[in-house]
C-alpha cells in the first residue's frame, strides 16, 4: 500500500489542515500471522525499535481490540525531516496494508488516531494533520482533535514543492514549536481567523484565489521563517514567477507554492534558482492533489 507525501498547515491552517500530493510516496507491505504483535523492518535505514510504525500499530490494536501477528516492511521514499509527513505516511501505509491483508473493517478515525499517536516517536507528541492527509487524501480539515473528526475536500490544485538539502535539525518539530508565540494580539487573531476561513472555503470550493489568501500567516510562519534556510528568497522568486500563494510545508524546511498550471514550470525554475543562489541543492517538483492510502480499501 502507498501513502502520499503531505503538506500540513498550508499557511494559516496550523495543526488542522493538510493536503496530500503526489510529490513522493511511502510504501508498506505486511504479512499477517498468528499471535499478537508487530515487527517492523525499514528498507534503507533503521529508526530504532520505538518508531512511528510500531507505536501506531500498538495504538491501533488498543483502539480497535484487534491484534494479530504482523510483519511489516516499509520503503519510505518521502524525504525525512523535511516537513512532508514522511513518518506519518509510513505509519498510515503500514496500517492500510495490514487492514487490507487481514480483511478487517475499521473507521478511518481509528487509523488517523493511531498514526497520529505514533508521531510521538518522531515529534514527542501526537499530531494528526499529516496522517489525516496521508490516510484520506485530498485536502483534510480537522474539525475536532478529541475525538478525532474531519471533513475532506477534493480540490483540483497544482503545487510546486521545494525540498532543500540541508542538515536535519535535531528534534525539529519540538524546536519549531518552541519558537511560536505564546499569545497574539486580538487584531492579529481576527486577521488570522479570516485567513483560516478563506483557506477552508477555498479548499471546499476548489478556488485557488481563496486558498492563496489563506496561505498568508503572520503568526506561526512569521516565527518559523527565520530558521528555514533560503525561505525568504524562495518565497520572493516564486511570487515573481507567478505563484498564487507560498508557505512552509509543515514546519519546513520544504516549501509549497500554489500555482496555476501555465505558471507551474516557471515557478519551479524560479524556486530552483533561488535555492542555487542561496548555495543550496534542492529537489523541486510539480505536484497535484492525490488520494490517500485508505481510498482503495
Swiss-Prot record:
It is found in: Cytoplasm. Pfam families: GHMP_kinases_C, GHMP_kinases_N. It is an enzyme of class 2 (transferase). GO terms for biological process: threonine biosynthetic process. It catalyses: L-homoserine + ATP = O-phospho-L-homoserine + ADP + H(+). Keywords: Amino-acid biosynthesis, ATP-binding, Cytoplasm, Kinase, Nucleotide-binding, Threonine biosynthesis, Transferase. Its EC number is 2.7.1.39. GO terms for molecular function: ATP binding; homoserine kinase activity. One of its GO terms (cellular component) is cytoplasm. InterPro entries: GHMP_kinase_C_dom, GHMP_kinase_C_sf, GHMP_kinase_N_dom, GHMP_knse_ATP-bd_CS, Homoserine_kinase, Ribosomal_Su5_D2-typ_SF, Ribsml_uS5_D2-typ_fold_subgr. Pathway: Amino-acid biosynthesis; L-threonine biosynthesis; L-threonine from L-aspartate: step 4/5. The keyword Kinase applies. ATP binds at residues 79-89. NCBIfam families: PRK01212.1-4, thrB. HAMAP family: Homoser_kinase. Belongs to the GHMP kinase family. Homoserine kinase subfamily. Catalyzes the ATP-dependent phosphorylation of L-homoserine to L-homoserine phosphate. This is Homoserine kinase. The lineage of its organism: Archaea, Thermoproteota, Thermoprotei, Thermoproteales, Thermoproteaceae.
Amino acid at each position: 500500500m502507498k501513502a502520499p507525501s503531505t503538506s500540513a498547515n498550508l499557511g494559516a491552517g496550523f495543526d488542522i489542515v493538510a493536503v496530500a500530493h503526489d510529490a513522493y510516496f511511502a510504501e508498506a507491505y505486511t504479512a499477517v500471522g498468528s499471535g499478537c504483535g508487530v515487527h517492523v523492518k525499514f528498507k534503507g535505514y533503521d529508526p530504532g525499535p520505538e518508531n512511528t510504525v510500531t507505536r501506531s500499530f500498538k495504538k491501533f490494536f488498543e483502539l480497535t481490540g484487534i491484534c494479530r501477528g504482523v510483519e511489516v516492511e516499509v520503503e519510505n521514499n518521502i524525504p525525512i525531516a523535511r516537513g512532508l509527513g514522511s513518518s506519518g505516511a509510513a505509519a498510515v501505509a503500514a496500517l492500510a496494508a495490514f487492514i487490507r491483508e487481514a480483511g478487517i473493517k475499521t473507521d478511518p478515525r481509528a487509523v488517523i488516531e493511531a498514526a497520529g499517536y505514533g508521531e510521538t516517536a518522531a515529534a514527542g507528541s501526537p499530531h494528526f494533520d499529516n496522517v489525516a492527509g496521508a490516510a484520506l487524501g485530498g485536502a483534510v480539515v480537522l474539525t475536532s482533535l478529541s475525538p478525532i473528526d474531519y471533513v475532506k475536500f477534493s480540490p483540483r490544485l497544482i503545487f510546486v514543492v521545494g525540498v532543500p538539502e540541508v542538515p536535519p535539525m535535531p528534534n525539529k518539530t519540538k524546536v519549531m514549536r518552541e519558537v511560536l508565540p505564546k499569545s497574539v494580539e486580538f487584531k492579529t487573531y481576527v486577521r488570522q481567523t479570516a485567513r483560516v476561513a478563506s483557506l477552508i472555503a477555498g479548499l471546499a470550493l476548489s478556488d485557488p484565489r481563496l486558498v492563496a489568501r489563506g496561505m498568508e500567516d503572520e503568526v506561526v510562519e512569521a516565527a518559523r521563517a527565520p530558521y528555514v534556510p533560503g525561505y525568504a528568497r524562495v518565497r520572493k522568486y516564486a511570487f515573481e514567477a507567478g505563484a498564487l500563494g507560498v508557505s512552509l510545508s509543515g514546519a519546513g524546511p520544504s516549501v509549497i507554492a500554489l500555482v496555476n498550471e501555465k505558471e507551474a514550470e516557471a515557478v519551479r525554475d524560479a524556486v530552483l534558482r533561488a535555492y542555487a543562489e542561496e548555495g543550496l541543492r534542492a529537489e523541486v517538483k510539480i505536484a497535484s492533489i492525490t488520494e490517500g492510502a485508505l481510498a482503495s480499501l
